[in-house]
Amino acid sequence: MQSIGIKGIGYYVPENVFTNFDFEKIIDTSDEWIRTRTGIIERRFASKEQATSDLAYGAALKAIESAKIKKEDVDMIILATTTPDYIAQGAACIVQNKL
């Protein structure tokens, strides 16, 4: 009997950082005001060249490393997003192809 499970986890955050101090420069607010009300310190933004599948690919590589397996050992990719690369093609297929 086969079993299914999560053997590793991974994440990826884009390099572009926008801090509360950056907000202070463009709108009437402060780091303290934002932080006390939301807990947010910084936000990460993908570049215009990066798609959802690029971010997911970075996370997948970390998950594979965390699981101590090879890319070829991955049997299934489940990727849920509200921001797909394309309307008609799932980002999971793109990540699978990149792996």
Label each residue range with its predicted role.
Residues 1-78, 97-99:
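Conserved "HGTGT" condensation-loop signature of ketosynthase/thiolase-family condensing enzymes
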